[in-house]
């Protein structure tokens, strides 16, 4: 890990870090699903982004027994098919996993593909490459799915995909499962997302604390979500801190699980990403920026604090005027901004929008106290509310809606970058 000088943004954090380590959440044992038997036919087919999704696409999958992995693909409009070799990436939960990256693709083009070994194949799936530059699209943002996935979370997830059937990708803000290496829970997650949704759109995922067991990231994580390979020069952050550019939006994943840093080396963990984030934001050709990580900048529930994340990352997010910061962890809904970014109109502010959401049924009691300690204000805050979020990007406007499973809009705003500068206007 590169040596990074102490951050002036992290002054007086020592006591807070000791407290954070002492209060780090423990996962208590209880009955959980076991390994799900992997099928001979390829399953858990998942699209994950590359750095350049206009011309390339990564796909991951698994089977029961080790085979010679292949991907066959062709333009959906017709023409000869191409078969390329994949790579065997590891084993977990009774299955062998594979990955392949298709390159030399044409922008804004539909492709059909299937994965297999040349004899046994998956069904055919379709994906569309990104446009080579800004173009309108929508995406989904899901908070913690984590608990009671099949009965409690899946109905909300399915409602999201039914409502946003034209979404180009999904952002997952961590805690996809409750027990990091429980294959049965991963099976439930894939079932909730659905085969076609997993295999036909990109999934930008950032890990939560429940994707860790102590200092160890889930063995499933790199097999499903390898990242784009452009993150910090730190092996402990591989596949968890990365970025991808999609039609005028730079999506950035950070790993905020500092209490899971090896040997509790919190300073290097957070500062390596701080330095990397500054570089990625300073050299950003896109008009829009979305950052996702699990633990919030401003904690949204009782008994929690975002002070460590604020010390390292808040100034960078504000300096580069990131548009959306999409988070999870607190099992409640909250949306707000720095008080310093208020305007004369109470329904309008400037600067980044910070959101915390939860898709699964586990709930905590929301509070505004940590927002206030961090110099921020809450504009919408909800408890006992499972939501999904649809974000539409079109030219100078970004429109955001948070909805419950029955389609009720519980929060909405629009970011407008036309005219005299950026304005964030409440719509609910």
Model-identified regions with their sequence ranges:
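Active-site neighborhood of phospho(di)ester-bond hydrolases with catalytic His/Asp-centered motifs
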Residues: 141-143, 169-175, 203-209, 254, ...
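Non-catalytic positions within long, well-ordered alpha-helices that form the structural scaffold/packing
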Residues: 161-163, 282, 318
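Acidic, histidine-bearing metal-coordination/catalytic regions of metal-dependent phosphoesterases
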Residues: 2-3, 19-21, 27-141, 162-163, ...
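Bacterial N-terminal signal peptides that target proteins for export
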Residues: 4-19
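Short acidic, glycine-rich surface-loop motifs adjacent to enzyme active sites
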Residues: 177, 258, 284-301
């Amino acid at each position: 890990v590169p040596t990074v000088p102490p951050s002036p943004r992290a002054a007086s954090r020592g006591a807070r870090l000791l407290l954070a380590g002492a209060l780090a959440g423990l996962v208590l044992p209880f009955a959980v699903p076991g390994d799900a038997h992997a099928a001979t036919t390829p399953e858990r087919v998942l699209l994950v982004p590359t750095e350049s999704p206009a011309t390339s696409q990564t796909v991951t999958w698994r089977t029961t027994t080790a085979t010679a992995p292949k991907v066959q693909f062709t333009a959906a409009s017709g023409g000869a098919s191409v078969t390329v070799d994949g790579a065997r990436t590891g084993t977990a939960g009774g299955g062998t996993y594979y990955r392949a990256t298709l390159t030399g693709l044409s922008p804004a083009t539909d492709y059909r593909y299937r994965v297999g070994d040349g004899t046994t194949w998956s069904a055919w799936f379709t994906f569309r490459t990104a446009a080579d530059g800004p173009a309108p699209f929508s995406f989904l943002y899901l908070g913690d799915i984590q608990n009671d996935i099949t009965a409690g979370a899946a109905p909300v997830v399915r409602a999201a995909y039914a409502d946003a059937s034209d979404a180009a990708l999904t952002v997952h803000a961590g805690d996809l499962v409750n027990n990091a290496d429980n294959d049965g829970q991963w099976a439930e997650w894939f079932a909730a997302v659905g085969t076609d949704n997993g295999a036909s759109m990109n999934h930008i995922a950032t890990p939560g604390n429940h994707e860790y067991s102590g200092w160890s990231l889930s063995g499933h994580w790199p097999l499903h979500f390898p990242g784009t390979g452009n993150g910090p020069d730190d092996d402990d952050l591989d596949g968890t801190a990365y970025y991808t550019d999609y039609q005028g939006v730079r999506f950035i994943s950070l790993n905020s699980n500092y209490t899971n840093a090896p040997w509790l080396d919190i300073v290097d963990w957070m500062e390596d990403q701080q330095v990397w984030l500054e570089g990625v934001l300073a050299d950003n050709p896109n008009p829009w920026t979305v950052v996702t990580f699990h633990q919030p900048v401003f904690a949204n529930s009782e008994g929690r604090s975002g002070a460590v994340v604020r010390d390292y990352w808040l100034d960078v997010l504000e300096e580069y005027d990131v548009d959306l910061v999409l988070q999870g962890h607190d099992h409640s809904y909250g949306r707000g901004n720095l008080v310093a970014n208020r305007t004369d109109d109470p329904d309008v502010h400037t600067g980044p929008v910070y959101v915390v959401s939860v898709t699964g049924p586990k709930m905590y009691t929301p509070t505004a106290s940590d927002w206030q300690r961090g110099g921020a204000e809450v504009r919408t805050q909800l408890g006992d509310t499972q939501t999904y979020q649809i974000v539409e990007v079109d030219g100078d406007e970004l429109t955001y809606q948070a909805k419950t499973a029955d389609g009720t809009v519980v929060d909405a705003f629009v970011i407008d970058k036309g005219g005299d500068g950026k304005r964030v206007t409440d719509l609910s």
